[in-house]
Amino acid sequence: MDTERSSEICGNVPDVTLSTPKGKVFSTPKGAHKRTPYSGHTKVNSSFKSPVQTSSTSPAKPEEEIEELKKRRAKLDSEIALLEKDGIRVDELEQHIDLLHEYNDIKDIGQSLVGRIAALRGVTTRDLYGQFGLELDD
């Protein structure tokens, strides 16, 4: 990096001289990121371990995947048939699911409001539940 570009990035900050673990000296603008001090540990370049979990099995072939999806669909169809046999309609289930979603949204908003009121009053939400006559399981 040339001096002109260095001052452009770091402003008019004086340079600082640093040294590496092997005694090599180099300079860097003051305030620039410095390297982690040398720990003396010899295995610096160990193999990288990804935090992403990978399956030990190889990816399924498209034909196998299609068969698995067909089995799953057949199982779901049989469950729907059993529910219909018990007198429950699919559209009724969809309505119940929609109502549960609406209930959960309203409950989340209510809990958020109780939390804000508790923060303003400097008390816990547990205290407010008691004041409002609510059960902690609500």
From Swiss-Prot:
The keyword Nucleus applies. Residues 60-87 form a coiled coil. Residues 21-66 are annotated as: Disordered. It is found in: Nucleus. Residues 42-59 have a biased composition (Polar residues). Keywords: Coiled coil, DNA damage, DNA repair, Nucleus. Component of the swi5-sfr1 complex, a complex required for double-strand break repair via homologous recombination. Component of the swi5-sfr1 complex. This is DNA repair protein SWI5 homolog. It comes from Salmo salar (Atlantic salmon). The gene is swi5.
